[in-house]
Amino acid sequence: TLIFLVEQEEVFMIYLDHAATTPVPKAVADAMYTVLTEEFGNPSAQYPMGQEMHRRVDAWRAVIAGAVGCEAKQLYFTSCGTEGDNWAIRAACWQNRHTGRHIVTTAVEHHAVLNCCQQLEQEGWEVTRILPDRNGDISAEAVLAAVRPDTALVSVMMVNNELGNIYPIADIARGLKAINDKTLLHTDAVQGFLKVPFSAKTLGADFITLSGHKIGAPKGIGALYIGPRVRNPRPLLPGGGQEMGLRSGTEATAQIAGFAKAVELRCDHLEDKLRHMAEVKAYAVEKLSAIPDLHIIGDGKAPHVLSVSMAGWPSQNVVTDLGSQGICISAGSACHQGKSSQVVAALHLPKRVAAGVIRLSFGPETTFADIDACAEALRNHHDRRMPML
C-alpha cells in the first residue's frame, strides 16, 4: 500500500499496475538528486568535473550491462523502450536492405514495434504477423515457419505486456541460425528485464530493448543492447557522437544514475523478489477465480502480470470504480490507452469477455492484503452492478 498526495491530502493507494510504471525508491531519487545538484558535469567536457562524470556514466553502464549479461560497450542508452524498439528495427532493416525486405513479427507486440513495422510497410517492406494461439502463446515453430531467404528481421517480444506470456526467444534464435543466419533477431525485453531470467550472451538476440521505469528507475531512460552480428549499426541520431557515436545528444546523467541504482536495488535478492511476485500472482488467481463471471485470460508464466475478464462488465467501468477506491489497475497497456487492445483482439475472445479484460501487475512491494482488497472490490463491483454487455 502506498501513500500519495491529492490536493495536499494523503490518500492511501493500492498499486497493482507495475507493468505500466513502478514506484521510484528513495535511494534512486537520492542518487539522481546528487547528480542534478552537485555532480552535474557534462560527460563530454574536458575539465575534471566533466571527465569524472564520463567515468561515472561508464561505471553506471557497466552495472546495467552486468544485469543484462553483456559487455558495457554493447549497451547504448536511450530515452525509452519505444525509442529502443524503433532504433533496433530500423538498424536491422538498414543492415539487410540489400538482401531482403521482409520482416517477421507477431500480432501482439507493443505498439512501438507494430507501428514501426506498419511505417516500413508504407516504405515498401513486407511484414508477416504471427497470431497467438487461444492462450496467447507464440511458438518458435510458428515464427520460424514464416522466415524466408529475404527475411531481414524477426522481432518478437520477450514477455507480453498484457498477458504475461513468455515467448521462446532463445529457441527462435537457435532456429534462425539454421534457417537464415543473415536474419537479425530483436526482442523487446521491457517486461522481461529482471522479471524473467536471461543473459544476452546465451539468449541469442541481436537487439534487446530495455526500459528503466519498469524496474524502479525514472521515466525517460532506457537502453538498447546491440550484439556482435550487427555490423556498423546506423546512428540513431547523428550529432556530437555520444553513446559511442550512435546516439548523439548530451547524456541524461541523472536518469542514467537512477537506472543503475534501480538495477542494483532490484538485483539484490532478486530470486526472493521474483518468488514473492509469483506467489502473489498465484494467490490473486485463487482469489479472483472465486468471483462469478470472472475468467483468467491467457497463459502468462511471467510472475508479475495477470489479465482477467469480468464478462459482461466493461473494463473501463471496472477500472474507474476501483480507482475511486484507491485501487490502481488497468484496462490494457497504459502506453496506448483509449484504443482497443490488439492483444485481446488477437485472442478472438467472445465479445462479452473481450470487453471486460483488465490487467493486474505486481511488484516486489505488492502484498497479499493488496490482493484481498482488490478481490473484494471486484466482487462488490460484480454484485452491485448489472452486466452491461
Residue ranges and their predicted role:
Residues I3-L389:
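Pyridoxal 5′-phosphate
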